[in-house]
């Protein structure tokens, strides 16, 4: 409740100042429509001031959180709260669009690491996989061990450097001979393993995102392309 109240405060009171924006627009128009061909410097200053004015004070505040330990995780969680209330007003909806664009810069795919997750990964990371599997529930530690340690099973995830144990999105892959008849055949843990190098087919049978606050910041297609390359 407290965080939602804080988000409403940011949306209502810390957006772009319309009076200041109007002044900046008028200053830019005066320079742009001026007849002085030597006024390029003034026009550039007006453009710079206009861009600065268009950046809401709340965005500057959120940027400060990014500097803190686990700051990006905190902000992703904060946006998940905003998503649940953004329908309440136009100002909250506008705030959400700004927030999403901000997160998209911090979670740009160029900053993310593709990792193959193995059974030797930290327990916290394995627990996150189990808790966020959205397609085929992990039924036991034996189940997750099979998915990670079997010679014909792989798991790949996109990891942000500041969130090493919180994969943003992950995918399970089964290496097989031919296409499996059904998904249950892939999920059974007592199947004979396909020896490394003998598989002729890779089946991507599940992909799950873990951060609701990054909704709209797409990683899925990038992850698939990277795993195909691997």
Regions found by a protein language model. Give the residues of each.
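Extended, composition-driven regions rather than compact fold-specific motifs
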Residues: 1-230
